[in-house]
Structures are given as structure tokens and as C-alpha cells.
């Protein structure tokens, strides 16, 4: 996604600063996901939130939105350090710091006029980038991803289904299914008119799901019908 938007590849490390790469991370003020979008900012960049789904926790959608936001900030401010500062505190605070510094446009020259958290934000990003870029030289070893992205694929869901039903009927650990589909807040994939929702599974389980989808959907419907209704009939 960074290549697509002509964003420096090093900015991938920003997600580590924001969320420690936890798709379901949520701050005390409500920022959510890998890229810690607030509800309003996420909505501006196409991330929908409803009772069942929070696109801010979808790694692919959130990363695409973050790239669009960073690109817009860079276009407005003309500098990647300033764009990073604006990502943290908003472009208004950066513009205010520029004015207070007498029109200077270098991050390090306006840093003292930024909010305290933002003053430490770019240094934190640079430190994180250094650690990961030069990890081998300093004896740090990475375990690699829990499940490689290229070892997964998606299925378009036709009927409402719970992740627990998928796990049970495809013989996958529920924690793994939830890990691959963090955007579903209640562990349920809904079916909504004019909306497309997908299920991500390990490639070797995609065929299992497709081959048995009628049975899986029927099982899910039966399970939903058995659930206690919130109001008396």
C-alpha cells in the first residue's frame, strides 16, 4: 500500500509506534486499530464502524486509509516529519506551531511549540525505525509473522455466520480465526444489503469452507435460531 501512494517504505514502522501491531488496540480516547484512527478521521477515509464491524481493526483497510491520510498530510505540509507530527496531533496543531516559531517549517525548529506528546512522537518513530532496520546488527531476532499474509485468502460471505461456527466446522482454532478477522467486534460476520464482508482463512482451509458452505451456513442459522432473544416474543 505504501508503494501505491508513493509513501516512504520506512513509514510502515509507524504502525508499531501507534499500536505495537495490534489490530484491536484501543486508546483511552477511542483511537482504534493498527493505525489508531479516531472514529471521525477513519470515516473521512472510508473506514466504517457499526455494531458488528470496525474497519479500523481491519489491517488492509486501515493501512490503505492510513496511507491516504499520510499522503494528504504530506501534500498539505510538504515534509514527512511534519506529516508524522500532524498524524499524531492533527494538522491544525502543526500549523499553529509553524506560526509560533515565526514561520519555520522544519520539525526540529518547531518542536518546542508542539504538544508534549507530539514533541516526542517523531523521535519515537525514528528510534523504532532504527531498531527494526538495524536489528540484526544489534542482536535482535524476529520470530516472523504468526500467519504469513500470503498463506491466507478471503471468501465472500453470503449469510450471517459466527467465527465460532467457522472454527468448529473447518477444524481451525477459534483464536486463529479471530486473529485473521479482527474487524468483527462480536465475532459475527453480518450480511447487509449493498455491503460486502469477507472471511479470511488459511489457504488450506478456504477449500474446506467452500466445499462445505451449505452445511456451514445451515449450521450457523440453526445455532442463531437457538439463541435466546433479547426481548420476549
Annotate each predicted stretch with a short phrase.
Residues 15-17, 21, 35, 177:
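Long, contiguous hydrophobic alpha-helical segments, chiefly transmembrane helices and signal peptides
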Residues 25-46:
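Short, surface-exposed glycine/acidic/tryptophan-bearing loops
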Amino acid at each position: 500500500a505504501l508503494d501505491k501512494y508513493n509513501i516512504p517504505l520506512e513509514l510502515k514502522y509507524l504502525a508499531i509506534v501507534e499500536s505495537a501491531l495490534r489490530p484491536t488496540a484501543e486508546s483511552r480516547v477511542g483511537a482504534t486499530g493498527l493505525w489508531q484512527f479516531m472514529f471521525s478521521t477513519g470515516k473521512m477515509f472510508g473506514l466504517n464502524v457499526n455494531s458488528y464491524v470496525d474497519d479500523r481493526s481491519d489491517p488492509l483497510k486501515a493501512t490503505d486509509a492510513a496511507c491516504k491520510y499520510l499522503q494528504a498530510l504530506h501534500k498539505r505540509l510538504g515534509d514527512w516529519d511534519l506529516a508524522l507530527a500532524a498524524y499524531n496531533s492533527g494538522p491544525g496543531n502543526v500549523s499553529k506551531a509553524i506560526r509560533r516559531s515565526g514561520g519555520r517549517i522544519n520539525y526540529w525548529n518547531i518542536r518546542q511549540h508542539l504538544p508534549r506528546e507530539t514533541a516526542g512522537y517523531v523521535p519515537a518513530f525514528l528510534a523504532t525505525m532504527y531498531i527494526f532496520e538495524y536489528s540484526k546488527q544489534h542482536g535482535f531476532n524476529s520470530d516472523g509473522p504468526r500467519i504469513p499474509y500470503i498463506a491466507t485468502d478471503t471468501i465472500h460471505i453470503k449469510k450471517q455466520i459466527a467465527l465460532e461456527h467457522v472454527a468448529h466446522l473447518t477444524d481451525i482454532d477459534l483464536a486463529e480465526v479471530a486473529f485473521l478477522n479482527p474487524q468483527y467486534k462480536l465475532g459475527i460476520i453480518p450480511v447487509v444489503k449493498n455491503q460486502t464482508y469477507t472471511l479470511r482463512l488459511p489457504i488450506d482451509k478456504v477449500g474446506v469452507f467452500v466445499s462445505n458452505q451449505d452445511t456451514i451456513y445451515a449450521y450457523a442459522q440453526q445455532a442463531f435460531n437457538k439463541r435466546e432473544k433479547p426481548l420476549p416474543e
